[in-house]
Amino acid sequence: MLRWVLIFLAVAVVAAILGFGGIAGTAAGIAKIIFYIFIILFAISLVVRLLQGNKRL
């Protein structure tokens, strides 16, 4: 699960960079939403991983 969160976080970061940079101005709002959703998912996944202990990825 952590792998997918990292993949989608990377996609969201790229989309956010393009959206915030003015290249895709119409998609900036969507990129911001996706970016923040995946930041939250990443944080949740990280906390769950830390609480589980030393299990393999």
Curated annotation (Swiss-Prot):
State if Transmembrane helix is listed as a keyword: yes
**Top-level taxon of origin:** Bacteria
| InterPro entries in the cross-refs | DUF1328 (IPR009760)
Sequence intervals crossing the membrane: 4-24, 28-48
Question: GO CC annotations?
Answer: plasma membrane
Keyword Endoplasmic reticulum in annotation: no
Keyword annotations of the record: Cell membrane, Membrane, Transmembrane, Transmembrane helix
Q: Where in the cell is it found?
A: Cell membrane
Q: How does it sit in the membrane?
A: Multi-pass membrane protein
Q: Which family does it belong to?
A: Belongs to the UPF0391 family.
Q: Which HAMAP family match?
A: UPF0391
* Protein name as it appears in the record: UPF0391 membrane protein IL0696
Question: Organism source for this protein?
Answer: Idiomarina loihiensis (strain ATCC BAA-735 / DSM 15497 / L2-TR)
